[in-house]
Amino acid sequence: MSAICVDSVFLLGLYDDRDQYHARANELFVAYFNNIFNRLLVPWPVLYETVSTRLVRHQKNLALFERDWRRLTGRGQLILLDDSPYRQAAIDECFSEVRVQRRESRALSLADRVIRHMLGETKIKVDVLITFNVADFADVCRRLRLHLVS
């Protein structure tokens, strides 16, 4: 059984058939989560970014999201990760970018910074990260020896 964390770019691609990553996201979802032994780890900030106005305006897409949500929950495969222990450090990192030369700064969203902190947390077991923003996570995955899938 693998613990697989995802970011919002993956979920947005999965539930929007017009998204450039839709086909690949669907392929990965089938490969990893039709297997009842894998668990889907979703940090709360990922949900806030995914269940956006864009998603809720398209009932068909929201219905697909709900279907998968209920199926994974029913199988015990869906784990929601509390971000509260990581919020302050993540926002402090965002603000510290103001004091860094532009070419040395990292333009990472608050949600991505929270995910990066969660990946390094020893209390949270993560085996795989699925993202289409490889550059935002390659260093931390390499350092922690996590499998990065895109």
Language-model features: locations:
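Acidic, PIN/NYN-like endoribonuclease modules and their adjacent C-terminal/linker elements
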Residues: A3, R116-S150
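Active-site neighborhoods of divalent-metal-dependent phosphate/nucleic-acid chemistry enzymes
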Residues: L78-F132
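Short, basic/glycine-rich phosphate-binding loops at helix/coil junctions
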Residues: V6-V9, R71-T73, D92-R99
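PIN/NYN-family metal-dependent endoribonuclease catalytic core
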Residues: C5-V6, E27-H58, R70, L80-D82
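Short, flexible helix/strand-to-coil boundary loops that buttress conserved ligand/catalytic motifs
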Residues: Y15, R54, C141
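Alpha-helix/helix-capping structural signal
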Residues: V9-F10, P45, A135
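A metal-dependent, Asp-based hydrolase signature
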Residues: Q59-F65
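Metal-dependent nucleic-acid phosphoesterase active-site entry motif
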Residues: M1-A23
